[in-house]
Amino acid sequence: MTPFIAPTYSESLMNFRLLTALIAMSFSWSSVYAGYWMDSNGNPSPDTASRRSIGEFGGWLLTTSDPDWEKKWNTPPETAPVFNEARMVTLGERIFTLTFFANPELDANHEANITCDLKVIRPDGTESINQRDVVCFQGRLKEEPSNIYLAAPVIDFLAEPGDPVGIWTIEITLKDNVRKVVIPLKTAFTLK
């Protein structure tokens, strides 16, 4: 995998960091198959703005308040991590938006090539982050393609004094460059 080291974004109103997750471990609490997400019991789950599939390629955004999200993720594949979903944040709190993908098409060398566009929109509609074609995952998968993998960019938000209150929107567009499939994903949280 080719790691992406993202710059630090500092503004007087907020502080975002894109972190690089240098791991792409899989787990089996849900998967995408035949064009839909399935829960741990194998039942189809409907697409949402933050979790959807196109064909057999799936993507999912999850915003968590877990400071130990990386430790929870780095578990054996048979252990399903449990993340606390964050929908609201207050001054001094930190949250993380994780991007997951499943079932990318592999090229002739059995490698995946996934990039993504990242956009974070403040409550007033202005953009805090707008990056295109960020490397999400490139290389060989460690497990089956249908398992769930963590994409490299992780958005880390720390609510600081002066940050605008209201709804912050995160839009990530996953691109399976081998399959030529694009999945737009969106999630939001409220800063109180």
Residues covered by each model-derived region:
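Serine/proline-rich low-complexity intrinsically disordered segments, especially terminal tails, linkers
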Residues: S12-M14, S28-Y33
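Intrinsically disordered, low-complexity terminal regions enriched in Ser/Thr/Pro/Gly
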Residues: G35-K192
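Bacterial N-terminal signal peptides that target proteins for export
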Residues: P7-L19
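Bacterial N-terminal signal peptides
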Residues: T20-S30
